[in-house]
Amino acid sequence: MKDSLRAVWRWVRWPLYILAVGYVLLVLYDVQRLFDIDKTNEAVAAIHAQKITLADVQGTNLPPIPDQAENDATIEGIDKNNNGIRDDVELAIFKKYPSDKKARGAALQYASAEQMYLTKVFNTETWKAVAEETGRAGLCILETETEIDWENIQELVANTQLRKETRTKNFEFITSHGSAGENPCDTAVN
């Protein structure tokens, strides 16, 4: 009887070991997936929370002219005033719209959304959140009733080969989406 139990155990233990190891691997995978979901949810919330302010539109915290070599060395570039818009892009928008605050606000909002394609997208959900914010910014541009060259803003934001490649690569996450469902403009400027 003892010998027959040992013989059965010899044949049964390996499948049991394999099942136990498989279960542990599955649990580890699921824990990692839950962390990824939390990371995505936090990133999406941060994307939707990023707004330009009236101080940004008025130029209260206007940054100094950045060193171009240092600014172009990374995808993010330099953003000294931490408003989500690269300093060279922000200064170019102020130069193009010096007296029209409404147009400047819409252009800054659009530039901020375009910058997020480079810095905030890492999966389909984050791409969708950025696309919704870009759509809001586009509607804000339409509300200004001013001729705003949005293609020029895209070119300002993606002005190096690395930035162009990153933007193109991030469009691999493209998916359908709706609107953000809020007021299109971050600021109410008249």
Give each language-model segment a name.
Residues K2-N82, D88-N190:
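Calcium-binding acidic motifs and repeat modules
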